[in-house]
Each structure stands twice: as structure tokens, then as C-alpha cells.
Amino acid sequence: DLPYIDFSKPWWSPSTTNDLTYGDDKALIAVGDLALSSLAATYCYFYDKTDAETYKIEDLYDVVWDGKWTIDYVMQVTKDIYEDLNGNGERDEEDYYGMTQQMQSALNTYLWACGGRVVQKNAQGIPELVYKTEKTNNIIEKLYQLCYESEGVCTARKFDQSMVTSSADDVIHYIGAISFKENMTLMTAGTLDMTINYFRDKSTEYGILPYPKYDEAQEDYYTMVDGYHAALAIPKSVQDLDFVGIITEALNAESYKIVFPAYYEVALKTKYAYDDESVQMLDMIVDSRIFDFGYVYDAWKGMTFYFQT
């Protein structure tokens, strides 16, 4: 037990105690507001509002609120959206599509968005593998339809590495962000920090949506946070637990009061959200974040990554 740490406080993610603990609520790592990247790395959908009007698409915010924002809906609304931008008469990587789907971590996110999990805690609080289920198989089949059988979805682009804002990341992870920035797609999936890193100079207004549900019977929208976000842990070698505990709690509390609002309320909600509806969507998305024990501890090579190609 670490003195002064209180996971009931609002500067700690509820998922820390709900999903990242084991046994009698033991936690090896925790996610708090000091780890600002846990907000930046949250997955969502983006859609081009100007193009949505051009293609006479209904108000997608209403679709979300009505519980009809599903993978089937995404396939239906994008299936006939296409434009031959390079004029070669062929559907290829240089054309405009209804949806551009990155086939890496943004694809993995559908597992949680559709109500699936890698592990869940049993009655004793011990994480158990729940990945190999009929539910997971159904999600995979649905994603196959989205990525390989829907003509309105593009899964490959020929972008240069120089178009990535961080030279350390491979361009394959950002085909959705670049396509959206360059007005080559109606919608895409990505992380919230793309609003700052890629879309600040986008020529048209866009909206922010949660990941779609598996079907309308699913009650809630869910999302996950990409693995590049920070988390907090205390080394076993620490001797002055009182000092570490009170400083850790204080830093998270002050970030909650000062830093988090500057990023979330000012940057994301004010500078990079174009309407009040996107602000409401942001609150929904952030409140629905899941930190799956099986994803956090799989070291980028576990079952979590079976979805991506």
C-alpha cells in the first residue's frame, strides 16, 4: 500500500481500479492526469463535415445519440462514396473513399468498441482470458466485411514517410490521418492528438465521433487508449514511500486542476473542435475509455494484436 494515494479522486482514471488491478485491488501501474498522453492517445472517429453535406449524409451526431452508430451503419453510409481523384479509371490508393481504415492499432480498437475484451477479472479479482469467444469471432467477421468487402473503405495508401509528424513512427500508422488531412476521405479512425498533430491546418471543418458499436443492441460506446500513453508505477526499491506517495498524488491532483484543463478544455474542446456537438462527443469518448489488463501487459506482441495485419 502506498500512503496518500487515493484512487477514488477524480485525477485517477476509474479504469485503474476497475481494469488494471488484480486480487484484492492490487495495482502495479496506474493511470492518472499526470499521464496526459492517456488522453491524447484515446481513439475516436473523425468525419469531414463539408463532405458529409456534399454527400447528403444525415446528422451523424444524432445517429450516435440514437444508438444507431454501428459498424454496419459505417459500411452502409460509405459504400457508395468514391471519387477517382487521379483520373486513371481505377480504384486505387490515390482516390477518395468514404472511409480510410488504418490496419494497425486503430483496427485493434474495434475489439473494445464492440464490447469485447482480452481479459476480465473473475469473482476473486484475478484476470482471466476471455478473448477466445464467439463474440470475438463475430467481431472479426464484422471487421473483415468492413475492411475487405466494403467498396467505400480504403485500407492502403502510398504516402511518403516525410508526411508523418514524428519521424520515429512508420507512415503505415498514419494513412488515415494523412488521408483525412489531405481531404481524401470522408471519415477515418485515429487518436485525439491527431487534431493537433495533423488537422490544425485542415482546410475543411470536421466532427469527432466515438468508435461505432458492434450493433444497436449494444448499450454503450467504448474506446481504448493506444499503448504509447504513459502510466505510473513505483519501483520496488523505493524506501521513502511516504514521500513518493504524497508527491505522486500531488502531481496528479495539480495536473487535474491546471494541465488537464488546458489540454482538454482549451486545446481539444475550444481550438480543435468546431461545434458543441463534438465537445459532447469528446466527453462521451473520454468517459468510455478502457484500459484492458490484457492489452496493457502484452508488450506489443500478445493476443491484442491478432486483429491487425
Which role fits each region the language model picked out?
Residues I71, M75-D80, Y110-W112, R117-D169:
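Glycine-centered hinge/linker elements that transmit conformational signals in sensory
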